[in-house]
Regions:
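Positively charged, amphipathic and often flexible ligand-engagement surfaces
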Residues: 1-304
Length: 304
C-alpha cells in the first residue's frame, strides 16, 4: 500500500482530480497550513506562541520550465522578507526540483545561491529538503557548492538509504547542519533498507554520529522510540538540549510536540502551505495506514 500511494503521488492525472475534490482538500488541510503565505504566517505565529520554532515550506516540486523555477525563487525571497517583518522564529525549507533541478544543475544552483544570500542578510537559514534518491547526489553537490559561499544552508539525510552514513560523514567534515529523517520516497532495495526495523536501527546509529559533532542538527521524527533513543543518548553524553532540536511536521503528533516543549527540548514545526499539496499529502497518507482509512471514509457520503 505504501509503495502504491507513493507511486500515485507522482501521477500527473490524479493530482488535478484530487486537488479539485473538496473532500481531499479538507483532509489535506490537516497537514497543510493553507493556500497562501498569510495562512503559513498565521500557523507559524501559533507555533511560536507555543514556544516552538517553524520552518516554512512553499509546496511545489518538479517544475518543468525555467520561468516557474524563477518564480519559486522570487517567492522564497519574499518569504524571508515576511518572516523578518512579522518577527517570526522561522526559517525556510525548500526542494531543489521546485527550483529547476530537473532543468539543469546550473540554473538550480544560481537560484539557491540567491535565496541563501538573501537569507544571510537576515541571519536566517535555508534547509534544502532531500527528495528521491535520483536527486541525492545532485542535491548534495548544490548544497556543498552554495555552502562554500554562505554557511547558512543545510540539508536533510534519510536513514533508509544505505549510502547515507558516508554522506553524513562527508557533510560533517565541512560543518554542514543536517536534518535527520527516515525518508519518505519509494526506493528500491538496491539503494534503501526495505525493512522498517533496519531503517530505525540506522536512524539511531546516525543520530549517534550527529549529536556529538558539535554542529546544530535537527532530529526529525514522530517516532516515540527515536525520540527516546535521542533523549537517552544526549543525557548519557551530556549533550545540552540547546545543542540540537527535534523537528516534526505540521498537524502530526501535536501531543508529542507539546510534550517535548514541556520537557524543555527545542522543537521546530515544518509548516507546508500552497495549492500544490498533492504529492506532499500522498506521502503523508503513505506513512500511516490510518490516514488512508480516514481519507477513504471521508469520501463516502454519510447517511442522514
Ligand atoms: P514512522 O513513520 O515510524 O512513524 C512513527 C509514528 O509517527 C507513527 O506510528 C505515527 O504515530 C506517527 N506518524 C508518522 N507519520 C505520520 C503521518 N503521516 N500521519 C500521522 N501520524 C504519523 N522525508 C524526506 O524524504 N525528505 C525530507 O526532506 C523530509 N523532511 C522532513 C522534515 C520533517 C520536519 C519531518 C518530521 C519529516 C520529514 N520527512 C522528510 C519525512 C520523513 O522521512 C518520514 O517519512 C516521516 O517523518 C515519518 O517518519 P517518522 O520518523 O515519523 O516515523
Amino acid at each position: 500500500m505504501r509503495s502504491l500511494l507513493l507511486h500515485l503521488s507522482e501521477s500527473k492525472r490524479l493530482a488535478p482530480l484530487m486537488m479539485k475534490n473538496p473532500v481531499s482538500r479538507r483532509v489535506a488541510r490537516r497537514f497543510v497550513a493553507g493556500d497562501n503565505l498569510d495562512d503559513a504566517v498565521a500557523a507559524a505565529r501559533g507555533v511560536n506562541q507555543a514556544r516552538q520554532t517553524a520552518s516554512l515550506d512553499m509546496l511545489g516540486e518538479n517544475v518543468t520550465d525555467e520561468a516557474s523555477a524563477r518564480r519559486s525563487a522570487e517567492n522564497y525571497l519574499a518569504i524571508f522578507d515576511r518572516i523578518a517583518q512579522e518577527r517570526l522564529e522561522a526559517n525556510v525549507s525548500l526542494k531543489l526540483t521546485q527550483l529547476g533541478l530537473d532543468l539543469g544543475t546550473a540554473l538550480c544552483e544560481e537560484l539557491v545561491g540567491k535565496i541563501v544570500t538573501h537569507a544571510a542578510r537576515y541571519s536566517n537559514f535555508v534547509r534544502v529538503d532531500m527528495e528521491g534518491s535520483a536527486y541525492t547526489e545532485r542535491t548534495l553537490g548544490v548544497v556543498k557548492r552554495v555552502r562554500a559561499q554562505h554557511e547558512n544552508v543545510g540539508t536533510v539525510m534519510q536513514a533508509y538509504l544505505y549510502h547515507t552514513e558516508q554522506d553524513v560523514r562527508e557533510l560533517l567534515e565541512i560543518g554542514c547542519r543536517i536534518r535527520l529523517c527516515k525518508g519518505a520516497y519509494n526506493e528500491p532495495p538496491t539503494v534503501a533498507f526495505p525493512q522498517k526495523s533496519d531503517v530505525d536501527a540506522n536512524y539511531v546509529k546516525l543520530m549517534k554520529i550527529l549529536l556529538p559533532s558539535g554542529i546544530y542538527h535537527g532530529i526529525a521524527t514522530h517516532d516515540p522510540a527515536m525520540l527516546q533513543a535521542t533523549k537517552e543518548f544526549a543525557r548519557e553524553k551530556q549533550i545540552d538540549r540547546e545543542q540540537f532540536e527535534f523537528q516534526m511536521l505540521y498537524g502530526i503528533r501535536t501531543d508529542l510536540q507539546k510534550q517535548l516543549v514541556r520537557e524543555g527540548y527545542r522543537l521546530r514545526v515544518y509548516i507546508p502551505y500552497g495549492t500544490d499539496w498533492f504529492p506532499y499529502f500522498m506521502r503523508r497518507l503513505a506513512e500511516r495506514p490510518a490516514n488512508l482509512t480516514f481519507f477513504l471514509r471521508s469520501l463516502v457520503p454519510r447517511r442522514s
